[in-house]
Amino acid sequence: MVKVGINGFGRIGRVVFRAAQMRPDIEIVGINDLLDAEYMAYSLKYDSTHGRFDGTVEVIKGALVVNGKSIRVTSERDPANLKWDEIGVEVVVESTGLFLTQETAHKHIEAGARRVVMTGPPKDDTPMFVMGVNHTTYKGQPIISNASCTTNCLAPLAKVVNEKYGIVEGLMTTVHATTATQKTVDGPSLKDWRGGRGASQNIIPSSTGAPKAVGKVYPALDGKLTGMAFRVPTPNVSVVDLTVRLEKPATYKDICAAIKAAAEGEMKGILGYTDDEVVSSDFNGVALTSVFDVKAGISLNDHFVKLVSWYDNETGYSHKVLDLILHTSAR
């Protein structure tokens, strides 16, 4: 049993918590957020995207009690004050989006935790790990990142294709669901003017660091991929469009067969495969981080192909945070 603390009970913090309820080998023992316990219970119990929490949620004497288990609740701004050791926390899920460097995340270590997993790309050279891509290279680093949800979708797919046929170069577009950083109506956004436009009214071109991050977790593709994002007015589930030029010739049918073999083999539980007539909402709640859509892709010729893969940018990512915790705890 790995004891886990969560710092930041927003979208990812709460979905990680929900996912952890399905894991008998993970126990959430502490949550830190500036929300009070009553509101924390409310936001866990009711979710507009994922529905009602499947279980009991109460607040008793300031603690969050979920399915009869008491969870310590704190509201500390400085992670150094969290005293994780008092409740036996081994790993902290850093999901505030604020402590994304070695220096700032180390405050959790100072507070008694053994390790930290960031739920987003780091702001420094903190090592990133993606399950199915480079998780086996973990060497005991106390502070790591689970990269981004888009990187977790793109990297497994790109790795399979590159190892089978070789990728000369590629462009990626993620058609990405709305996230909490966006505006409900037009509002100030000085660093990204288009990002300040109303999320429900627009398709918004944006940047993404996912292709560059793939080069870090899978160096064979370093410098070979770049990409962009379109933010679209849907609440959840995103899709990657990966267009690549191949070294070795391959028919689209051959590529699909290679991806299917990986999904049923070494990438099982990470990469999925579907030939159904699916749309985005069909992937809401799917724990896989990348589901290849056979019928959505196309090829121009045996060297130039477009591949499409879906991901629940909340659920799939959160499950891989937990998978990474278990993998790094088993060392």
UniProtKB/Swiss-Prot annotation:
Its EC number(s): 1.2.1.12
PROSITE patterns registered for this protein in UniProt: GAPDH
Subcellular localization(s) per the UniProt record: Cytoplasm
Binding residues for NAD(+): 11-12, 33, 77, 313
InterPro entries to which the protein is assigned, alphabetical: GlycerAld/Erythrose_P_DH, GlycerAld_3-P_DH_AS, GlycerAld_3-P_DH_cat, GlycerAld_3-P_DH_NAD(P)-bd, Glyceraldehyde-3-P_DH_1, NAD(P)-bd_dom_sf
Location of the active site: 149 (nucleophile)
Main location: cytoplasm
Any one GO CC term of the record: cytoplasm
Site annotation Activates thiol group during catalysis: residues: 176
Binding site for D-glyceraldehyde 3-phosphate: 148-150, 179, 208-209, 231
Record's catalysed reaction(s): D-glyceraldehyde 3-phosphate + phosphate + NAD(+) = (2R)-3-phospho-glyceroyl phosphate + NADH + H(+)
Protein name: Glyceraldehyde-3-phosphate dehydrogenase, cytosolic
Biological source species: Leishmania mexicana
Gene: GAPC
